[in-house]
A protein has these predicted regions:
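Polyanion-binding surfaces on beta-sheet-dominated domains and ring/shell assemblies
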Residues: 1-57, 61-116
Length: 116
């Protein structure tokens, strides 16, 4: 199981630690060559509220063998904030995967051109 550190767990209202670990693992698995060494999920409550639900900021940071990746987002309730941050993190993971694939393709193309 992945090592996930959560800060301000008192703000977790409708989402559990197990769900957080499962969701982050799902995002990390989209890029097999990336091994996650550590994940940190941080929640911060703002004073603003909507119908009694506080505005929460969530930051997710992954330390991997490919460098650091992060995603952050705000939402009313920990669940909403976490999923906004998770979407941004997922986009960053897929972008990193695409950049590495482009570099690999470029190297293959240059080798082919060198052989001609």
């Amino acid at each position: 199981q992945m090592d996930v550190q959560s800060t301000n767990v008192a703000l977790l209202d409708t989402i559990s630690r197990e769900e957080i670990v499962a969701e982050i693992t799902g995002v990390a698995d989209k890029y097999q060559e990336m091994q996650v060494q550590h994940a940190h999920v941080r929640f911060h409550e703002h004073k603003e509220k909507l119908r009694g639900t506080p505005l929460i900021q969530c930051q997710i940071r992954l330390r991997t063998n490919r460098g650091q990746l992060a995603g952050s987002g705000e939402g009313y309730g920990a669940d909403h904030a976490f999923h906004v941050a998770l979407d941004k993190l997922e986009r960053n993971v897929l972008e990193l995967k695409g950049i590495n694939a482009d570099e690999e393709y470029r190297g293959q193309l240059l080798r082919k051109l060198g052989e001609l």
